[in-house]
Amino acid sequence: MKLIYLLIGCVTLALTTGASAGALSDDFWLLGDFTQNVPCKGDGSDPVEARVKISTDQIDSKVGVCKFLDAKADGKRVNTHVECQFPAGPLMGDITFTQKPDNTIDFVDRDKTYTATLYRCPK
């Protein structure tokens, strides 16, 4: 019986450790407030539909919230697996973010059906 409890504990630890393995650190370059496809003024006058906030665990925009299930950084690129909550229901997908020299970030989904440029808002 003790062996079963030990095994359950090990499986639980492995699952919780694996689930957080792809989390983004608090100082990661991808995090912050952005606008999509238009330069950000950051003075409150940016269109609501263009605003995007990326935190350590999710992307929040007017169309919905996408939670990071996994994130793998590779230099100036981050490949993510997300679950998005939309009014029509949940959707899972893969998104790649690429940091550009001009301080913008390219955003593209796996199937290349949606691309965008994210402009960082001044703090």
Describe each model-derived feature in a short phrase.
Residues 1-4:
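Positively charged n-region of N-terminal signal peptides that target proteins for export
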Residues 6-14:
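Bacterial N-terminal signal peptides
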Residues 15, 33-34, 60, 78, ...:
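Processing junctions and N-termini across compartments
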Residues 20-33, 122:
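N-terminal helix-cap/turn-to-beta initiation motif at the start of protein domains
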Residues 42-83:
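N-terminal glycine/threonine-rich, aromatic-flanked beta-hairpin/loop signature
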Residues 81-123:
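Beta-sheet ligand-binding and adhesion/scaffold domains
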